[in-house]
From Swiss-Prot:
Family to which this protein belongs: Belongs to the gastrin/cholecystokinin family.
Full protein name: Preprocaerulein clone PXC202
This protein's UniProt keywords: Amidation, Amphibian defense peptide, Cleavage on pair of basic residues, Repeat, Secreted, Sulfation
One GO MF term attached to the UniProt entry: neuropeptide hormone activity
Pfam families recorded: Gastrin (PF00918)
Organism of origin: Xenopus laevis (African clawed frog)
Sulfotyrosine sites (modified residues): 13, 77, 141, 156
Biological role: The pharmacological activities of caerulein are quite similar to the physiological activities of gastrin and related peptides.
Length: 187
């Protein structure tokens, strides 16, 4: 294929990164884009295959677990990164994309849930405290930055709840002591 490679010296010894060859086409840019897209697709497919083999066992092991997968093909109990293989399907690219999107969605949802629980309590806990928030619209979406509540209630994490005005008159002193407590806990 040497005669079909670029005249400017761009060689493709393995053949997997030879995008943009100018065989009989005039629109080099379109060829580049399609070639690069194909390269990215192959690289992603190879990475997914390597990851599935490493994290989900050999293909033989995964085949043995077909009967334990979800009906939609999105789950593999032993291979948790084997996105949505459906043995009878032909459209591998669509399946990979949908399975990978499902995996990313589940991972993001889990991360957000863990972060919300760790930093600000569960959603139900925060909803219960809506009536205890400032009337001036200062909201606490995550629960870990809700400083300034006036009812003496403790923040879930407690490490940034400085400056509450419970029954004290000297707000500045309260702020200073609360901020010192915050720094102490943070350190």
């Amino acid at each position: 294929n040497d005669e079909r490679r670029f005249a400017d010296g761009q060689q493709d010894y393995t053949g997997w990164m030879d995008f943009g060859r100018r065989d009989d086409e005039d629109d080099v840019n379109e060829r580049d884009v399609r070639g690069f897209g194909s390269f990215l697709g192959k690289a992603l497919k190879a990475a997914l295959k390597i990851g599935a083999n490493a994290l989900g066992g050999s293909p033989q092991q995964r085949e043995a677990n077909d009967e334990r997968r979800f009906a939609d093909g999105q789950q593999d109990y032993t291979g948790w990164m084997d996105f949505g293989r459906r043995d009878d399907e032909d459209d591998v690219n669509e399946r990979d994309v949908r399975g990978f999107g499902s995996f990313l969605g589940k991972a993001l949802k889990a991360a957000l849930k863990i972060g919300a629980n760790a930093l600000g309590g569960s959603l139900q806990q925060r909803e219960v405290n809506d009536e205890r928030r400032f009337a001036d619209g200062q909201q606490d979406y995550t629960g870990w930055m809700d400083f300034g509540r006036r009812d003496g209630q403790q923040d879930y994490t407690g490490w940034m709840d400085f400056g509450r005005r419970d029954d004290e008159d000297d707000v500045h002193e309260r702020d200073v002591r609360g901020f010192g407590s915050f720094l102490g806990k943070a350190l």
